[in-house]
Each structure stands twice: as C-alpha cells, then as structure tokens.
C-alpha cells in the first residue's frame, strides 16, 4: 500500500477503517461459557472481532482452573510461540504489585501506565498479547485501548508523509542497566513482517524512548495525534474477574489503582504471532 494521503489505495483503506471504528466497548465483547473449555463458535466470534478491531474483550462465566487451560485457549486463537519475560521466566506473567525493590517495572506496581505497545524495547517483535483478570483492583486500574491502525490513519491524513517514522532509526530505546539490554534503534510503524500488516513500536514515557534528529518533529506530531485527535477512538474498560483482553498489540495503557484486601492480579501472555 502506498502510504500517502493522495494514494487511492490508502484512501480506500482509510475509508474502510473508518467504517469499522467501535462506537462502544460492547462491540468488542464476547461472552464465553467456560474459559477452560471454549467452544468453537466462541473462538470463531473472538477471531472475527479481532480481525475487525485488532482487539477483543471476553467474559467467562467460569473461573480459570489452570494456566494450561489459558494457554490452550490462546493457542486456539492463534498464539504459538511466547515471550518469556525477565520477571517470571514463564509463558504466563503474573501482573500484580510486588513488594521487592528489585522490581522497578511499572506494570508490577500500582502506578499508571501511559500509552505504549508491548515489547517496543525488544529485538523480537511482539505481535499479540492477552490480559486475563483473576482479581480486579478495588479502585481504578482501568485499561485504555487504541487501535494502532487508526493512529496511522490519522497521522497520514493530517501529515501525509509517514516514511520517517518507518525508518529503522526513528525510535531509540536507551540501554537498560536492569536487564543488561543494549541500546536499540528501531521503527515506529512497519509493514515489513510475515503478515504484511501494521506493527507499531512506541511508548509515551519520555524516559523510555529517544528519537533520531530526523524523526523528532514527526514523533512530536505523533504524540499529539495519540493524545488529541485519536481520543475519540480510544476505549476505556475495567476488567472484572474472569474477563480478558486479546489484541494484535494495539496501543494501550492503564490507570493507577488501589487495592483493598485482595491485590489486583492479571495474567499476561505475549506472543510472536499475530491473531
């Protein structure tokens, strides 16, 4: 696809994308009877919604009995290989506040998370992820969601030239002393993957990213588009127990939260496959 505001191909894609903007969270919601034994019809519905919106929210009537059941569920959707992070060293990460000074990652605290895509700092691209709620926070903790394809659409319609944000050196991730990760230079938008679909690497946290001189102004415009022009497209939702989110690694964030007697606990799976 030619990515300019004057391209017939792009304008056709942009028009089709506009037709599939969710007007409310219910358009993303699928009721499933049992997360431990998801029916074929329920899986089909989830896949259809993800194909349309790059995101789906499911709600199970039954408690999750084991992590292996959750893995079987995501494999039926399309996940096959997984990112094992440095905290849990497992296919499934437990996202809950931790009382150890060794853990400085914001997801494992009660703090807010600004707009980002998962794994933007990794060499290998994360194409999809799941969050499953075991226990919600007593106050706050809402997730906010924004289809990255809508961000691309808005950027091109308002600025025309996207090429600088597709260069490998557009986004610079500083080295991490916590994980011994070297500095990474990468793209923000790319179609150069096996799926020929949009993949995005980005974070709104200023301490986490830098930019090339060429891309600096474009990134400033991108941030404005995410915060202002795309605000109408973002959806906010607080997961209840036995609910979850599946996405093609769209932009997302989290409000800060407070816990009462039971800590907020989510299970996270990140995959190298697109759904």
Positions of PLM-derived features:
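Surface-exposed charge patches
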Residues: 48, 72, 163
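Structural motif
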Residues: 59-62
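Active-site environment of non-heme Fe oxygenases that use a 2-His-1-carboxylate facial triad
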Residues: 2-43, 90-239, 244, 250-275
């Amino acid at each position: 696809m030619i990515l300019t505001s004057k391209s017939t191909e792009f304008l056709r894609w942009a028009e089709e994308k506009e037709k599939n903007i969710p007007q409310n969270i219910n358009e993303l919601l699928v009721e499933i009877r049992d997360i431990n034994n998801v029916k074929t019809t329920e899986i089909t519905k989830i896949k259809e919604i993800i194909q349309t919106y790059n995101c789906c929210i499911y709600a199970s009537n039954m408690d999750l009995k084991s992590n292996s059941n959750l893995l079987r569920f995501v494999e039926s959707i399309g996940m096959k290989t997984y990112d094992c992070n440095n905290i849990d060293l497992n296919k499934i990460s437990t996202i809950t506040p931790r009382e150890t000074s060794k853990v400085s990652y914001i997801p494992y605290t009660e703090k807010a998370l600004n707009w980002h895509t998962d794994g933007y700092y990794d060499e290998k691209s994360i194409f999809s992820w799941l969050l499953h709620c075991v226990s919600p926070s007593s106050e706050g903790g809402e997730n906010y969601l924004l289809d990255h394809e809508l961000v691309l659409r808005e950027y091109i319609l308002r600025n025309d030239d996207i090429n600088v944000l597709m260069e490998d050196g557009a986004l610079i991730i500083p080295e991490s002393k916590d994980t011994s990760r070297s500095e990474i230079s990468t793209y923000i938008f790319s179609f150069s993957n096996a799926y020929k679909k949009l993949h995005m690497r980005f974070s709104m946290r200023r301490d986490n990213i830098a930019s090339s001189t060429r891309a600096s102004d474009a990134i400033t415009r991108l941030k404005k588009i995410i915060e202002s022009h795309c605000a109408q497209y973002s959806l906010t939702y607080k997961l209840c127990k036995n609910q979850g989110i599946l996405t093609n690694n769209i932009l997302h964030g989290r409000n800060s939260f407070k816990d009462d007697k039971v800590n907020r606990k989510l299970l996270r799976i990140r995959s190298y496959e697109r759904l």
